[in-house]
């Protein structure tokens, strides 16, 4: 009996602390300064660890293992320039050397598939899973790492799991109950309140520190918000500062439960990517949605898949064909505190969340950008590329022309044929692509 009473007191004390110091402040969108103190201590610790590692690691090893240095040194010049030093006439057998070189570069380290795996860090951040290039430096550094493991798994993880459980449970229950109400302004207000509150709680569960820039450009009702995509928590990051009607792929498991509950309270659009009829239905729903300027802005991730936050890949044109005002948003995570990228082919949602909750924190910057509209004579593809370029520049990301669908599918023949056509034009046009 005494053991049960003690356990009950510990549990009640724990829940009281969680409720008083985290839940209530997150509901009202205020901070007690605890996370700021935690981040200051964390930054100082990682800076100290970086200095210790640099002092104890030979310079040659640092250069060799630096994540900023690839396996190979690429020649980024276009085909026309790359072949100019090899060919003297319209065609020479030596042209084979150029294509062989490019082929070997792609086999060793292509610029696409590496975007579907976690970004390597220049300096170890005291997390076991990023300890790729770390070797023993000193007893003091090892003790700091051990202390970090204890803090992350014995203190932060139970707290974060508690918050995540409360946040997700409230979201599922709240949206289900609100969904039973008839359509009215009250239902819309309650739906926004539930989404906003629960997302703030879930962000606290990840020790999220978010810096919003240019808030005067926040997406307005009746518009379309497009952003680069790294993780499902992109939705949490954006919804913490404002509500959206979301468009996305149907999921199973925990994500599916959340999706089915959310759609009861808010006109989110979930679809199956492989179904053509779903795609037509989505286009129709989106056109109807943006026609009503009283509805929430639509949140779309045009890449269609999660990229590791180093690049922005091809934007699907569908989002840019329906008209309306586009509100671009750039999201950039700081990998030094935790890896936000979701490798869906390797981890399910629960495993991914556990990895996030055992990281130091999730730190990111969000840039709202001036609204953009389709210019006269500009087709949907050109408009999509213009928006993608703006997001890449603002977020400091690499812009790539490749389709994120290559994560799941083979390269289309059209990409191979394009390279063949360029080479043919050079021969027919005497070495010019124009």
UniProtKB/Swiss-Prot annotation:
Its main location: endoplasmic reticulum. This is Glycerol-3-phosphate acyltransferase 3. It is found in: Endoplasmic reticulum membrane. Keywords: Acyltransferase, Endoplasmic reticulum, Lipid biosynthesis, Lipid metabolism, Membrane, Phospholipid biosynthesis, Phospholipid metabolism, Phosphoprotein, Transferase, Transmembrane, Transmembrane helix. The HXXXXD motif is essential for acyltransferase activity and may constitute the binding site for the phosphate moiety of the glycerol-3-phosphate. PANTHER family: GLYCEROL-3-PHOSPHATE ACYLTRANSFERASE 3, PHOSPHOLIPID ACYLTRANSFERASE. One of its GO terms (molecular function) is 1-acylglycerol-3-phosphate O-acyltransferase activity. Its EC number is 2.3.1.15, 2.3.1.51. Widely expressed. Expressed in liver, kidney, testis, brain, heart, skeletal muscle, thyroid, prostate, thymus and placenta. Also expressed lung and adipose tissue. GO terms for biological process: CDP-diacylglycerol biosynthetic process; glycerol-3-phosphate metabolic process; phosphatidic acid biosynthetic process; regulation of TOR signaling; triglyceride biosynthetic process. The chain crosses the membrane at residues 14-34, 137-157, 161-181. InterPro entries: LPCAT1-like, Plipid/glycerol_acylTrfase. A motif (HXXXXD motif) lies at residues 229-234. It is an enzyme of class 2 (transferase). Inhibited by N-ethylmaleimide (NEM). GO terms for cellular component: endoplasmic reticulum; endoplasmic reticulum membrane. Converts glycerol-3-phosphate to 1-acyl-sn-glycerol-3-phosphate (lysophosphatidic acid or LPA) by incorporating an acyl moiety at the sn-1 position of the glycerol backbone. Also converts LPA into 1,2-diacyl-sn-glycerol-3-phosphate (phosphatidic acid or PA) by incorporating an acyl moiety at the sn-2 position of the glycerol backbone. Protects cells against lipotoxicity. The lineage of its organism: Eukaryota, Metazoa, Chordata, Craniata, Vertebrata. It is a multi-pass membrane protein. The modification Phosphoserine is found at residues 68, 77. The gene is GPAT3. It comes from Homo sapiens (Human). Pfam families: Acyltransferase. Belongs to the 1-acyl-sn-glycerol-3-phosphate acyltransferase family. It catalyses: sn-glycerol 3-phosphate + an acyl-CoA = a 1-acyl-sn-glycero-3-phosphate + CoA; a 1-acyl-sn-glycero-3-phosphate + an acyl-CoA = a 1,2-diacyl-sn-glycero-3-phosphate + CoA; dodecanoyl-CoA + sn-glycerol 3-phosphate = 1-dodecanoyl-sn-glycerol 3-phosphate + CoA; sn-glycerol 3-phosphate + hexadecanoyl-CoA = 1-hexadecanoyl-sn-glycero-3-phosphate + CoA. Pathway: Glycerolipid metabolism; triacylglycerol biosynthesis; Phospholipid metabolism; CDP-diacylglycerol biosynthesis; CDP-diacylglycerol from sn-glycerol 3-phosphate: step 1/3.
